[in-house]
Amino acid sequence: TSEIAQELADKYIKGLLGYSYTPSDPIPFVDVDGSPLGYIVPVVTSNRAAGYLVLDASDDEILTGYRFGDGLVSPMDRGGDLGVESYSFNNPVVMINPFEFGVQSLDGSITTNCGRTIPAVSIEGRPVVLSNKPSSWNDVVIYATQMQDYTVSGFRSISQFMSYDESEIKRLTAHYACMVTAFSNVAELYGIANLYSDPSQYMQIWNYTNTHALSDEEQTVPGVVLGGTPISTCATGFTNYCASRGSTLIARTVSSPAIASIQNEINSNRPNVLHASLYNGSAHSVTAEAYATLTGKKTGETRQMIGIADGWNSSLSFLKYDQSYYAWTYGTTFSK
């Protein structure tokens, strides 16, 4: 019940933040099949928004996510029209994944707090097969529109999710490089740069990391310069960029990071940038900001996954991080 959710939230809040913070009215949410799951509980202090908790009764941990910060509102207070007045008993809040919630419309589509509209056909139950010999990144990434096929447990994340959308990067800068985008997420998370207020910072990161334009044959997007970044110089370059912005953030890159080390960084509220190549030579960089165990509803198969900003979408995706899938992997960590 909402009363129990508020009592639980109050205990969590007092333990995490102190007695000056209190829970507001819990907002119930369901899964994509309409089954009740839990509550989003906004947090306030001095009548000002200060974050929220996600309580999921289907998870053994109950508290499956939280974000705190001055003025930080709950997911249902974001996204323009997607506010508390948008949902009702007949149009409940739906959890797409632990970072993304939405409201189902009469046509069956879901509008989410990430500004996406998921067509009804995209949320019908359909199996997602992850190849053990992936030839495409679609074989190793589970996107938000596929999350209805999985049960999520043991979800952990950094305190705030950040993911620049590829189309927005191209619109703002007329450039795109996956590693520069991943580092831009990190710069935003640490308060070093915001591309919406100053898009030129993307090119600053581009230049500091020695990102270069791809060959003419690889330039496939009219009006947009596509780039590649050498792993050997990315950490030093990003560290120097941060210093130019007055930040003491230091980046370090290591080869073949274990999943446990990635999880430890996330537990310490620090994002990672992961770099990997499939055996066909397709390389990509993503920002690791969460992790969870996903169980296929139809297959029963359980997988340990890394929650990522995938460089293409604004919503959370999950990456199958199995070293045997990749020709090589590197990880960039951050410290002050």
Residue ranges and their predicted role:
Residues 60, 78-108, 259-260, 267, ...:
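Active-site signature of cysteine proteases
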Residues 6, 10-22, 65-102, 106-227:
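Active-site-adjacent structural segments surrounding the nucleophilic cysteine of cysteine proteases
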Residues 16-58, 94-110:
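Exposed beta-strand-loop-beta-strand "reactive/processing" segments of non-cytosolic proteins
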Residues 176, 184-185, 213-294, 298-301:
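Predominantly the structural core of cysteine protease catalytic domains
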Residues 56-60, 115-119, 123-126, 291, ...:
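A short, sequence-level motif marking secondary-structure junctions
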Residues 39, 51-53, 176, 286, ...:
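Residue-level detector of short, conserved catalytic/binding motifs and their immediate flanks
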Residues 20-26, 87-93, 247-254, 331:
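Generic structural motif
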